[in-house]
UniProtKB/Swiss-Prot annotation:
PANTHER family: UDP-N-ACETYLMURAMATE--L-ALANINE LIGASE, UDP-N-ACETYLMURAMATE--L-ALANINE LIGASE-RELATED
Species for this entry: Gluconacetobacter diazotrophicus (strain ATCC 49037 / DSM 5601 / CCUG 37298 / CIP 103539 / LMG 7603 / PAl5)
Organism ancestry: Bacteria, Pseudomonadati, Pseudomonadota, Alphaproteobacteria, Acetobacterales
Pathway membership: Cell wall biogenesis; peptidoglycan biosynthesis
Protein location: Cytoplasm
Binding-site residues, ATP: G115, T116, H117, G118, K119, T120, T121
Keyword DNA repair assigned: no
Protein name as catalogued: UDP-N-acetylmuramate--L-alanine ligase
Length: 480
């Protein structure tokens, strides 16, 4: 990989423990740059960066800058952060996370994956395809890729695959040769204001590709399909289950471990159609078949053969917190999933049904008051595949509470719309007892949310085991 053209000194990341920030910091460190950072609290990303040799301070203080010559911030960092204030006072350049990512992307041919849902998994699948094709890509993802144990991969090849964050409009800065749009549902309207403004930004995201690049669009999603006539000057490849898709899935067979499917590949320019597959994807849900189709579309356009595509999918180990099994006890399976938008929640619960669950118990921690308020109706109708819904308090993520937008409002909204079994979670400490009283062998307990619920999902199997066999639990305590 080429380096940035000038010596830029020590790079300081404010909020280095964030998933996006940590990935960029790790790649810069692997490129040989001096990298350091700070965050408000310890987390797994901070520990991983320290293990890689990057100094991370806990807490924000002007003294943390040290000899830094560049400061990188994310949208979560306020302008009055003491490190940012000190950097500006010392005339140190303050760079947004997306700007730094864009500079890294200029050093490679880049694939940028955007969309409301499925970005992280699709980014990981495309990375797996390029890696299987021995293109040795660099990867910066928005989630932990199980095969890497991190959200980054430093490759020596010409290609880079990145997840593009649309939440603050920063994805418009990213210079890519290939763009992917998985879907487009109303989200982050606190930034965009209207769905129309968000859609216009996606149009620009795709329009930024050069004439020799191409866009990969999910035609199954109506808002994405509506983009096609507006982007007629660009090369477009569509994918999905629709008969109109250029890369179309057929004969999808699902089981408890994943899906098998065939693909019809249509080349509109040459008026040719061929069949490919079957492909085996060790992931549950039709939404993940769609994600795989996006990776196939990229692979086909890059002349990667079908055998390589099959190999990439067969060995795919998934992404952390995407339908991740944290344990099984007494025949009850506990799942941890990042899903926090109604569309994601519905897809995950449907996947649990497809996996053969006797019944599905959803434990939902709404993420942000503003999201719950904006999408309240959708939240109240997205959980029909769960036999029982346990609703936790809203994870604020730094937001102030909004009157009337809370756990109890969601519980009432679900009940009013006909859900027969919805209960509030009084406190996380009561979760295991509640699940123990409800769950039966063969059930899936699906913990959903982008906040602290992941910690509950990790602890729940052990807590259930202790409740199922209290004598063994007491014996273990005595031995300790």
């Amino acid at each position: 990989m080429r380096a940035l053209p000038l010596s830029i000194g020590t790079i300081h990341f404010v909020g280095i423990g964030g998933i996006g920030m940590s990935g960029i910091a790790e790649v810069l460190h692997m490129l040989g740059y001096a990298v350091q950072g700070s965050d408000i609290a310890e987390n797994a990303n901070v520990q991983r960066l320290r293990a890689a040799g990057i100094t991370v301070a806990i807490g924000h203080d002007a003294a943390n800058l040290g000899a830094a010559q560049v400061v990188v911030t994310s949208t979560a960092v306020r302008r009055d952060n003491p490190e940012v204030v000190a950097a500006r006072a010392r005339l140190i350049p303050v760079v947004r996370r997306a700007e730094m990512l864009a500079e890294l992307m200029r050093l490679r041919w880049a694939v940028a994956v955007g969309g409301t849902h499925g970005k992280t998994t699709t980014t990981s699948l495309i990375a797996a395809v390029l890696e299987a094709a021995r293109l040795d890509p660099t990867v910066i993802n928005g989630g932990i890729i199980e095969a890497y144990g991190t959200n980054t991969r430093m490759g020596s090849g010409d290609w880079m695959v990145v997840e593009a964050d649309e939440s603050d409009g920063s994805f418009l800065r990213l210079p890519s040769v290939i763009t992917v749009v998985t879907n487009m549902d109303p989200e982050h309207l606190d930034h965009w204001g209207t769905a129309e403004a968000m859609q216009a930004a996606y149009d620009q995201f795709v329009s930024n590709i050069p004439f020799y690049g191409f866009a990969v669009l999910c035609i199954d999603h109506p808002a994405v399909q509506q983009m096609i006539p507006r982007l007629s000057d660009h090369r477009i490849v569509t994918y999905g289950f629709s008969p109109q898709a250029d890369i179309r899935a057929e004969k999808v067979i699902t089981d408890k471990l994943g899906a098998t499917f065939e693909v019809v590949v249509t080349n509109r320019n040459r008026n040719r159609t061929r069949r490919a597959g079957p492909f085996r994807l060790p992931m549950l849900g039709h939404h993940n078949v769609q994600n795989a189709l996006a990776a196939i579309a990229v692979g086909v356009e890059m002349d990667i053969d079908d055998a390589t595509l099959r190999s990439a999918f067969a060995g795919f180990r998934g992404v952390k917190r995407r339908f991740t099994r944290t344990g099984e006890t007494g025949g009850i399976t506990v799942i941890d999933d990042y899903g926090h938008h109604p569309v994601e929640i519905a897809a995950v619960l449907k996947a649990a049904r497809q996996a053969g669950a006797r019944d599905v118990i959803a434990v939902v921690q709404p993420h942000r008051y503003s999201r719950l308020q904006t999408l309240f109706g959708e939240f109240c109708t997205c959980m029909n595949d769960a036999g029982t819904v346990i609703v936790a308090d809203v994870y604020a993520a730094g937001e102030a509470p909004i009157p009337g937008v809370d756990r109890d409002a969601l519980v009432e909204g679900l009940r009013e719309r006909g859900h027969r079994s919805v209960v509030p979670l009084p406190d996380p400490e009561h979760l295991a007892e509640m699940v123990h009283a409800i769950a039966r062998p063969g059930d899936f307990v699906v913990c959903l949310g982008a906040g602290s619920i992941t910690n509950w999902a990790q602890a729940l199997p052990g807590q259930l085991a202790a409740l199922q066999n209290p004598a063994a639990a007491r014996k273990g305590e005595c031995a300790a």
